[in-house]
């Protein structure tokens, strides 16, 4: 174990330790930490080493691969996950969703009357995406009698805590219209001045859950719409292909799958039908 003096220095991340950590992260959550990510790993994990009183990255790796270190393994994945997002990110996707929701709602009131409209935000980060989905549903469907369920999952417990609270600083709201802000958010006062909280009626539409995309989704994840955006860019091709085919299996017939604009299913073996760039249908 390290001595207090180590808090004042930056520990060396040896290539052998970086490779071990990279393999572990890939096995656990599919993230591909190539050689260009070495400094990022060093920077983000150094704090964990200092707080955990570890003398080296080797000691830290040994700990997170033991039964006693499983909680710290979760914290390590949290630290290495990239969670940058904002409300209505890639707005074209929400425009497409608005155009197909009436058809989906009609199906619930026709042949599938009473069936629940299920949407899965598969890498929800700090909650902006699923809340954007909930607002879109409310805007398009209003109070129509269509049961709706939004499942929001992420591997990071840290961002899920933020998502559940639904409180965001003013700068995260810069692309949200005044009408949306007034209708679906509460502006803070006192110590919360400069913050907005998603109103309870919208928060109640979303169920948050920690889930690793490398695991098999349970049957109750079956969805009509899946948003799995800006996460596959961190995976290698075999992992991307595995994930895309899992998403296909969990998607209901005629359902839609949205991926990030910087992502593509080109070159991957999959059964999806192409709709438009970054939008696919089963």
Annotate each predicted stretch with a short phrase.
Residues 2-120, 260:
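Conserved AdoMet
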Residues 98, 134-138, 248:
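A structural alpha-helix within SAM-dependent methyltransferase catalytic domains
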């Amino acid at each position: 174990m390290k001595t207090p003096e180590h808090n004042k220095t930056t520990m060396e991340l040896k290539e052998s330790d970086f490779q071990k950590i990279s393999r572990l992260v890939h096995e656990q959550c599919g993230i591909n930490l190539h050689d260009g990510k070495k400094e990022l790993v060093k920077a983000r994990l150094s704090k964990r080493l200092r707080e955990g009183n570890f003398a080296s990255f080797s000691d830290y790796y040994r700990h997170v691969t033991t039964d006693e270190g499983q909680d710290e393994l979760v914290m390590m994945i949290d630290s290495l996950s990239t969670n940058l997002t904002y409300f209505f990110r890639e707005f074209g996707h929400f425009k497409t969703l608005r155009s197909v929701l009436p058809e989906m709602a009609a199906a619930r009131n026709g042949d599938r009357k009473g069936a629940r409209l299920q949407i899965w935000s598969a890498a929800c980060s700090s909650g902006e995406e699923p809340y954007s989905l909930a607002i879109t549903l409310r805007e398009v469907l209003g109070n129509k009698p269509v049961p709706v369920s939004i499942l929001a999952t992420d591997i990071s417990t840290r961002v899920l805590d933020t998502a559940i609270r639904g409180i965001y600083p003013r700068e995260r709201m810069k692309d949200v219209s005044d009408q949306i802000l007034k209708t679906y958010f509460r502006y803070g006062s006192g110590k919360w001045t400069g913050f907005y909280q998603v109103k309870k009626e919208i928060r109640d539409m979303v169920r948050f859950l920690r889930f690793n995309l490398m695991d098999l989704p349970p049957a109750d994840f079956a969805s009509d719409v899946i948003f799995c955006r800006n996460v596959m860019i961190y995976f290698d091709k075999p992992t991307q292909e595995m994930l895309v085919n899992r998403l296909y299996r969990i998607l209901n017939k005629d359902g839609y799958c949205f991926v990030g604009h910087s992502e593509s299913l080109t070159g991957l073996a999959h059964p999806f039908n192409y709709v438009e760039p970054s939008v696919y249908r089963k």
